[in-house]
Amino acid sequence: MVAAGDKKILVVDDEVSVLALLKEIFSTAGYKVRTARNAEEALKILQTETIMVMFLDLRLPGMNGIDLCWKIREKDKIPIVYAVTGYSTLYGILECRAAGFEDVFVKPVPTTLLLKAAKDAFEKLGRWKVRDYDLI
């Protein structure tokens, strides 16, 4: 099993305070955390780094979180991507599932739930690990 410090999480949110809080939560748990304030920054990070667990805000300036998830899925179907939003509707949840989100969390999200989601995601990736393709 890979240690938490070897596991990277990408957090995308346009609110600086939310980015700082999520970075602190995941970093304290031992994860390496990359942050982006919009979809374009996130896509740049993903061009140069392999990150298999992501938490995306849905309401981003420019490209929204759902469209960002579609873009991520065009290139790689394996990453586990979570939606984090302040607004939730049945239609929005259906859109998220269609785009490839693993789950949808409505703000404010309890810290324990976010940490459990990250832990579960990395455990799942560990089970999926295939020869010559290091998922985490």
Can you name each region flagged by the protein language model?
Residues 44, 66-77:
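Short amphipathic alpha-helix used as the core "switch/output" element in two-component signaling
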Residues 67, 88-103, 116:
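Alpha4 helix (beta4-alpha4-beta5 surface) of REC/receiver domains from two-component response regulators
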Residues 20-28:
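Charged docking surfaces used in two-component/phosphorelay signaling
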Residues 19, 61, 89:
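The feature encodes the CheY-like receiver
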Residues 109-118:
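C-terminal output helix
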